[in-house]
Amino acid sequence: MSELKIRDPRDIILAPVVSEKSYGLLDQNTYTFVVKPTANKTEIKIAIEQIFGVKVTSVNTMNRKGKVRRTRTGVGKRPDTKRAIVTVAEGDRIDIFTGPVA
């Protein structure tokens, strides 16, 4: 049998996505994270459960292409990113956006 290579969960989950759309999904127990592009759904689920101590019910991922930007010296490209939309079980919450509201 093949062995699942366990990586450090903090290397898989890079940052939460802070946007209006991600704030709107908080009421549905759905959170959005920027993840390592090589991570799969199983690794993302295990990492979220280990870091935040919640039960994950589903993981959806999307690959986003980096935009091409022109500069004075030529053309550059922003890096490609991968996002994970994670739904946690009813009653579980992840407090990543807590703090004073401006």
From Swiss-Prot:
It comes from Cutibacterium acnes (strain DSM 16379 / KPA171202) (Propionibacterium acnes). One of its GO terms (cellular component) is ribonucleoprotein complex. It comes from the Bacteria. It holds the Pfam family Ribosomal_L23. Belongs to the universal ribosomal protein uL23 family. GO terms for molecular function: rRNA binding; structural constituent of ribosome. Keywords: Ribonucleoprotein, Ribosomal protein, RNA-binding, rRNA-binding. Part of the 50S ribosomal subunit. Contacts protein L29, and trigger factor when it is bound to the ribosome. One of its GO terms (biological process) is translation. Gene3D superfamilies: 3.30.70.330. One of the early assembly proteins it binds 23S rRNA. One of the proteins that surrounds the polypeptide exit tunnel on the outside of the ribosome. Forms the main docking site for trigger factor binding to the ribosome. This is Large ribosomal subunit protein uL23. InterPro entries: Nucleotide-bd_a/b_plait_sf (IPR012677), Ribosomal_uL23-like (IPR013025), Ribosomal_uL23/eL15/eS24_sf (IPR012678).
